[in-house]
Amino acid sequence: MWNKNRLTQMLSIEYPIIQAGMAGSTTPKLVASVSNSGGLGTIGAGYFNTQQLEDEIDYVRQLTSNSFGVNVFVPSQQSYTSSQIENMNAWLKPYRRALHLEEPVVKITEEQQFKCHIDTTIKKQVPVCCFTFGIPSESIIKRLKEANIKLIGTATSVDEAIANEKAGMDAIVAQGSEAGGHRGSFLKPKNQLPMVGTISLVPQIVDVVSIPVIAAGGIMDGRGVLASIVLGAEGVQMGTAFLTSQDSNASELLRDAIINSKETDTVVTKAFSGKLARGINNRFIEEMSQYEGDIPDYPIQNELTSSIRKAAANIGDKELTHMWSGQSPRLATTHPANTIMSNIINQINQIMQYK
């Protein structure tokens, strides 16, 4: 059976399909629907405060008794100067003026937020905790393991996968360059951050680690799931496939943009957040590209552009807000999450029967 392996057993799920924990875009209905369909629904906790995360977990539990997870951002060392912030504020001034916005006060609460997310995950006994942007400290990993919480790390290179296994992760997401949203890279190479495609990355990671590997990036249907399994993955993580679902928190602006875009429309940019992320190209990205080397690191840039992005989205201006998407938008649908899950499973079973 294609759907029975170490990962499904470890996570107590029927099918090795994980809905990515997309911060700002998941809803209790989406998470529970995926879990009720036999996959692993994941709460995108990245931007939640403690109360919001507690409420989200409680709501998910009202909708499902099945396993689910929480995805959290691991804090990173920020590298920026006051002149970078001053320059960026000057460059962003025309956008703020056009949208009638004040210059924001930057508040960095990453460390405290992360600690609260971990405390809440343990307090609420969430079955699975997924990490992106790095690996948590040894003490945090120990606390989570003592609470019998399964840990899933993210890797965009073989070296990052090895580091995840060494740190004690129970499974690893191999995030290919096709993936939408933020890159999970955390080891800084000599030249540039890894941009290795899923079909290349997965088998190379599988060959050097002993824990289950989860393929991510460009996977939208049963064909992608089966291809990943053939490459040695024991599961897949899908983001964009569920982002356009009517159960997600995506705006109609974003949903329509993805549904109507093509595979050549996305780019990888730091313009919105200070961290590389894949999204649909627009005017803001193109105009900010001239400052690429001077953009402050995440979360500084994320704070500086936040009000611009929100205001633009509120008035339906897709040229000034982030439109995260993977490279397979032609395969996106607006079906409910349970329909997406059943379509994937049925397609896999049909292919297996045909073969």
UniProtKB/Swiss-Prot annotation:
Annotated catalysed reactions: 3 propionate 3-nitronate + 3 O2 + H2O = 3 3-oxopropanoate + 2 nitrate + nitrite + H2O2 + 3 H(+)
This protein's UniProt keywords: Detoxification, Flavoprotein, FMN, Monooxygenase, Nucleotide-binding, Oxidoreductase
UniProt KW Ligase keyword: no
Cofactor names: FMN
Keyword Aminoacyl-tRNA synthetase: no
EC category name: oxidoreductase
Record: residues binding FMN: N71, Q175, G180, G218, Q237, M238, G239, T240
EC code: 1.13.12.-
InterPro entries, per the entry: Aldolase_TIM, NMO
Gene3D superfamilies reported in the protein's UniProt record: Aldolase class I
Molecular function via GO: nitronate monooxygenase activity; nucleotide binding
A Pfam entry, by short name: NMO
Cofactor binding notes: Binds 1 FMN per subunit.
A GO BP annotation: response to toxic substance
Similarity comment: Belongs to the nitronate monooxygenase family. NMO class I subfamily.
Note: P3N is a potent irreversible inhibitor of the key enzyme succinate dehydrogenase in the Krebs cycle and electron transport chain. P3N has been shown to be a toxic metabolite to bacteria, plants, fungi, mammals or any organism that uses succinate dehydrogenase.
Function: Nitronate monooxygenase that uses molecular oxygen to catalyze the oxidative denitrification of alkyl nitronates. Acts on propionate 3-nitronate (P3N), the presumed physiological substrate. Probably functions in the detoxification of P3N, a metabolic poison produced by plants and fungi as a defense mechanism.
Name of the protein: Probable nitronate monooxygenase
Source organism: Staphylococcus aureus (strain MW2)
Organism lineage: Bacteria, Bacillati, Bacillota, Bacilli, Bacillales
